[in-house]
């Protein structure tokens, strides 16, 4: 997965300076969401550990602790409360070569890009995930089994990366997964800073289902603009989302207070092909537009604000959201210099 590749590469590359010291990273945040007039609150923390073992092995895991406070329904006053704590994934990586990493354990399914690249609370520009985030992620978003990933080809003009995985069925409360398999292939063009990829998953238990996806990421050089998009299709629904954000390069860029503002826009639509539901996509055709304005403080602190208008045959709703996120990163102990 993308995070694994980055952390593994960083840990191995910095071995001389840090003697393979485990890193603890993650984020802590506090979020509010007002949906159709009802406001809920959700403080949470997502710690992540990456622990190199020698030159070729890496253990990594991310967990979540979340408290949710929400209005009591049925005209009852006051708030209800829910708590969850558990691992999101826990895996071991064997870096066989620069072209191949072998992953075993509980891993995040690499279908399209949101699940394994953008779902961390310190990375996403908007509090809510896309409406099609459930397509191809087999309910839990993770698998228990093995995965092969790496760079199949790389040059100054283009690079090709791949993931291929198989997951067994697991009914464990913390490591729940479906029997399934799939893969993803992406091509990146460094000169144009463009990435295009395709994904395919197949559920292999109960009713077998196929999922198809494609993604396009583009970051035009020297503009401060980013565009990310996905299309996903399952047996019962399909949809897409397109998200853009912008950080000005004027006024000293991120060193100036104006350069820390980050406007965000996401447009998305979902379409149901039948009334069967096994994918987490809304039960009726839905359109949603999100308008966000984030502020990036120094020292890894972000404020997220957004307004969304959602249209569907069921009803139209307004969604107001705010949040503050702190990203942390530190070694577990001081390494010895060679």
Task: Give the ranges of each region predicted by the language model.
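Detector for outer-membrane/organellar transmembrane beta-barrel domains
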Residues: 27, 55-56, 186-278, 326
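Outer membrane beta-barrel
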Residues: 20-26, 37-169, 177-179, 186-193, ...
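Outer-membrane beta-barrel "beta-signal"
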Residues: 148, 244, 317-338
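Transmembrane beta-barrel architecture of outer-membrane proteins
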Residues: 43, 86-88, 168, 179-181, ...
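Cleavable N-terminal export/targeting peptides
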Residues: 1-19, 332-338
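Solvent-exposed loop segments that connect transmembrane elements
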Residues: 71-80, 272-282, 327-338
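Structural signature of outer-membrane beta-barrel domains
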Residues: 31-33, 66-68, 109-112, 167-171, ...
């Amino acid at each position: 997965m993308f995070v694994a590749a980055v952390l593994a590469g960083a840990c191995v590359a910095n071995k001389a300076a840090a003697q393979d010291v485990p890193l603890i990273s993650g984020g802590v945040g506090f979020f509010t969401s007002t949906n159709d007039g009802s406001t809920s609150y959700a403080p949470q923390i997502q710690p992540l550990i990456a622990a190199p073992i020698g030159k070729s092995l890496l253990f990594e895991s991310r967990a979540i602790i979340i408290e949710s406070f929400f209005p009591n329904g049925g005209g009852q006053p006051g708030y209800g409360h829910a708590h969850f704590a558990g691992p999101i994934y826990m895996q071991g990586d064997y870096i066989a070569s620069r072209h191949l990493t072998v992953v075993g354990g509980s891993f995040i399914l690499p279908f399209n890009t949101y699940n394994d690249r953008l779902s961390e609370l310190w990375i996403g520009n908007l509090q809510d995930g896309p409406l099609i985030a459930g397509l191809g992620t087999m309910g839990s978003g993770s698998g228990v089994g093995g995965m092969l990933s790496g760079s199949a080809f790389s040059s100054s003009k283009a690079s090709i990366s791949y993931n291929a995985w198989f997951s067994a069925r697991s009914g464990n409360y913390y490591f729940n997964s479906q029997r399934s398999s799939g893969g993803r292939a992406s091509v990146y063009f460094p000169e144009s800073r463009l990435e295009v990829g395709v994904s395919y998953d197949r559920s292999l238990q109960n009713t077998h289902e196929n999922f198809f996806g494609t993604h396009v990421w583009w970051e035009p050089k020297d503009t401060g603009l980013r565009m990310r998009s996905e299309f996903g299709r399952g047996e019962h629904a399909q949809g897409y989302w397109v998200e853009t954000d912008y950080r000005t390069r004027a006024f000293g860029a991120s060193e100036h207070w104006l350069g820390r503002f980050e406007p965000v826009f996401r447009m998305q639509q979902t379409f149901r092909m039948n009334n069967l539901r096994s994918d987490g996509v809304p039960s009726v055709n839905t359109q949603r537009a999100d308008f966000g304005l984030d502020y990036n403080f120094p020292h890894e602190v972000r404020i997220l604000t957004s307004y969304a208008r959602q249209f569907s045959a069921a009803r139209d709703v307004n969604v107001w959201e705010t949040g503050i996120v702190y990203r942390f990163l530190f070694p577990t102990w001081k390494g010895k210099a060679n």
